[in-house]
Structure formats: C-alpha cells, structure tokens
Amino acid sequence: MTARHRVKRALILTWLVMLAPLPSQAAKGSACAMTHATIARDEAGIRETMAAYNAALNGGKTAAVLPLYTEDGVFMPPYSQSAIGKSAVAAAYDKVFEELHFDVKFTIAELVVMAPNWAYVRTNSAGTTFHRSLGKKLAEANQELFVFKKGDDGKWRIGRYTFSPTNPPSK
C-alpha cells in the first residue's frame, strides 16, 4: 500500500468515526433517533394538535387553546407585542376572543420535523370572523407559521405562533 493510499484510508476512517453516532446520540432526543416511522408518528401528532387548535380557535375558548401551548410558548399576532409564557398567552387570547368569533379552516402547506423535539408548520387559513365591536362578519385569510416542541409526555405543543393577514385591509 502506497503512502497516498494510507493517508486516504486514514482520512476515510477518521470521517467515519466522526460521523458515526455515539451511543448517547442514538438515544431519544437526538437526530440519530429519527426514523421514517418516528417522523410519521410525529407528523400525525402535530396534525392532531393543529386540528385541536383549529377547533379551539373556532370555539373561542382560551381554556381550550392554552393546553396546546408549551409553558414558555410565544404568541406573536401582527401589530401587537409578543405574548410570552402561558399567562401572557392566555391574556392575549382572552382579548382576541372578546372581540372576535372565528369560523376558519387551517390548511397545512408545509410540515417539517426538524429534530426529534422540534418541528415547524406553515399554514394558510380562510373563513370569516365576526367582529363584536362592529357587529359584522368579515372575510378572514391568513398565512401562519407554527413552531412545535415535543414535550416529555410525547405530545406536540405550540412553542411559537405568528401570522399575517393575506386579505387587503378593510376600508
């Protein structure tokens, strides 16, 4: 074996050792633990949470929305400061539901499990909102971004949520 082949072989072995997962990395919570089966289960769990959020939003109950957020969840509506943590998120949704009654449907445009405990979902929603202060129903359409975090109990919850309207402003 020539010196060139020995160097090449040593480099290949070095790369293999560097890329091989350590036993601790193959445990729960590592990228190495992600398989097609676990990703499929995770996607199903995220879709379940999205459906629950859609129902909770249309139901207008903060108590139904809150369990879908992580303890450190952040709600970032347009033209408002971020609501950080469950108590702030609860206060923000109380205000939203005080003014608006939703009849919307979310459509998932993109769902990506990025790591064993993190995923994002890009959605579009459309329907109507009844504005109590105006006494009228208006068309509603938004694009949304959800960042999900899997809890120790295996449930996927909303860690971050923001949206922007896609309808032009009312005149």
Where are these regions (language model features)?
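Bacterial N-terminal signal peptides that target proteins for export
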Residues: 2-12
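Sec/Tat signal peptide C-region and signal peptidase I cleavage site
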Residues: 22-26
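Short, low-complexity N-terminal intrinsically disordered segments enriched in polar/charged residues
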Residues: 27-71, 170-171
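Short beta-strand edge/turn micro-motifs at domain boundaries
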Residues: 27-30, 141-169
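Short solvent-exposed beta->alpha transition segments
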Residues: 70-101
